[in-house]
Amino acid sequence: MAEIKKKPVKIVETVLRDAHQSLIATRMTTEEMLPIVDKMDQVGYHAVECWGGATFDACLRFLKEDPWERLRKLRDGFKNTKLQMLFRGQNILGYNHYADDVVEYFVQKSIANGIDIIRIFDCLNDIRNLETAVKATKKEKGHAQIALCYTLGDAYTLDYWRDIAKRIEDMGADSLCIKDMAGLLTPYKATELVKALKEGTTLPIDLHTHYTSGVASMTYMKAVEAGCDIIDCAMSPLALGTSQPATEVMVETFRGTPYDTGYDQKLLGEIAAHFQPIREEALKTGLLNPKVLGVNIKTLQYQVPGGMLSNLVSQLKEAGQEDKYQQVLEEIPRVRKDFGEPPLVTPSSQIVGTQAVLNVLMGERYKMVPKESKKIMLGEFGQTVKPFNPEVQKKIIGDETPITCRPADLIAPQMPQFEKECAQWKQQDEDVLSYALFPNVAKEFFQYREAQQKKVDAAVADKENKAYPV
């Protein structure tokens, strides 16, 4: 038998970003990361995902850290490893659409401060919302990876994935990621999907999933055998549950096969030992809830992400209507269909979930409609894969005319205004971008930073008389 050609699988390590975002609410501090960077740099990872997603907001809001400073420190430490971030297309790292000038400047500064690979996605898979970020990444000589949100439904056939993969390659992306945020992709479906993508594109394929439904490691195995080039894994202390499969386990799985990573398990063991106390402490304080470490099979039954299920429970609990849970679960696919079958990822998951709860609690569908539901129906988030239900759209938006263009085409440049508003706090160019994304949170952080630098607490200072209590 002819020798099988070696094709080592590449690994993106998520322990510094998605792993702690998924398990401990993004609370790992920069100081907890830095001592292990040197060892992580010796592994030979394809990349370390360490920035973007919710880390930016969490740094400013909860940890009182400058996210840009974190990036610079990590860049100093990782001499041989590419650094990767997650970027929400036209939403950047926030929750609204921004003008192109903000997107371009954010990309420029991210790369200037040390990012090599930008993973760019849109919650509706509307690739018009990715164009500006991709062009900006290429202009700054970065690696533009486009991520497609994986989901199930009538619209999402193998032809759909094959076709969109080709369009992504034509856009100038350097690689393609399938982002399975809910852990819906099962092993044999992964084989079919990877093969279909390989027919549509020559780009390297990266698979990102979560262990929520218990199938993720098997899914990776079948995907790699089908030709997947890169998989996202997390060091074992912060793996499994709502996080990713464990790095060490996947390394051992492929040892001695054509997909052998060649990583050193002894070195990985030393890295894991660094994160173990962080896990123990999080369990002790309750930051890591053992519930998120279990297998949530409802995810597969209802095709709903785990985080969305827990949101529904708390919404119904608040309303004292927990007995309506089953009805809401059955209403979700109906609302999703009415809304053009979007992938269920932030913010579409929250919009569809809240609307389903209201439909059930009101006893009448679309009697009460939050403004986000209206925004989706007006096309303000972008284009869905399938058309909206016209009757539902009419009921929600009345005589208003929906937009059909790329939403950001209607947003005038915003940087000059942000520069003006942020002028009094600005100590570095990047501060304006922090302010642009999270104005109130950034302002609080800037005040905190100033107090630390001047050793003055603005809250007790008498500014009028320039006096300070001793």
Regions from the language model: what does each represent?
Residues Y156-I168, S213-D229:
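Catalytic cores of alpha/beta
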